[in-house]
């Protein structure tokens, strides 16, 4: 059955440009301007921190030292789906580069709340990302990343099922269910290449505040609803040391240490 997880500790970790994403509430983030994705199967705790017992997914954005230019993506679809992305990659010298990117994504949805007339599953999300990369010497590399994302989406567009006809009615609730989230992830990574080993230090901070509202009676009458709020701050520190030459021609050694501190306040009915 594999390795399971409970509460906010997933069994498979996510990293963005070397920055760990701690909470599962941060996993459904918008991915854009990616350079590559690595999927590592099996336990990865030797070189990575918590939540990597079952594997690891590493996402990498474009490095401004390797890629320069301006990218703009526009998209329009049914139900007034709209998508805008932009990114600028600048290389100021052979040793310093910067990238600045942003996006907006939204759709009106497929269902309408009969009670309020509002779109029951519309959503809007937006965000921006700043990345600074410096390589002052051939041995030292510095990387700073700041990624902010905002989500505001209506949800849970459930309707009554007519067992005789097999048709489902449109949602009809007095409270519009939905989810809102503000999330900021930042990280600073220092890399050093020695003659026989590579050393990496990553310090990260994550801020997350969200609010989920559910109309649990799914009726126009106000019988039952649920509201959950989360407020989270987390910091991590990782050190990794890897040999860059095989010992005895076959053994590649590696080890690392990891520290994290998470403060989470949840306001929810139990």
Predicted regions and their residues:
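Short beta-turn/strand-loop junction motif enriched in small, turn-promoting residues
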Residues: 3, 43-45, 244
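Non-cytosolic beta-sheet module surface loops
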Residues: 4, 76-78, 205
């Amino acid at each position: 059955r594999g390795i399971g997880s409970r509460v906010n500790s997933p069994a498979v970790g996510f990293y963005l440009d070397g920055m760990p994403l701690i909470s599962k509430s941060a996993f459904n983030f918008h991915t854009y301007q990616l350079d590559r994705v690595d999927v590592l199967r099996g336990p990865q705790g030797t070189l990575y921190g918590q939540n990597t017992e079952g594997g690891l997914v590493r996402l990498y954005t474009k490095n401004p030292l390797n890629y320069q230019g301006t990218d703009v993506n526009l998209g329009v679809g049914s139900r007034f789906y709209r998508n805008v992305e932009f990114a600028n990659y600048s290389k100021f010298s052979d040793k310093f580069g910067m990238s600045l990117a942003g996006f907006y994504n939204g759709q009106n949805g497929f269902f309408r709340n009969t009670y309020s007339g509002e779109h029951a599953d519309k959503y809007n999300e937006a965000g921006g990302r700043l990345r600074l990369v410096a390589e002052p010497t051939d041995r030292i590399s510095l990387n700073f990343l700041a990624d902010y994302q905002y989500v505001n989406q209506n949800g849970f567009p459930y309707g009554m099922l007519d067992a005789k006809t097999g048709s489902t009615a449109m949602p009809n609730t007095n409270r519009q269910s939905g989810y809102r989230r503000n999330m900021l992830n930042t990280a600073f990574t220092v890399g050093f290449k020695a003659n026989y080993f590579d050393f990496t230090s990553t310090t990260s901070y994550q801020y997350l505040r969200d609010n989920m509202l559910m109309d649990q009676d799914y009726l126009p009458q106000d019988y039952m609803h649920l509201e959950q709020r989360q407020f989270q701050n987390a910091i991590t520190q990782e050190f990794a040391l890897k040999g860059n030459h095989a010992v005895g021609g076959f053994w590649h050694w590696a080890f690392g240490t990891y520290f994290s501190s998470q403060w989470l306040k949840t306001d929810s009915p139990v």
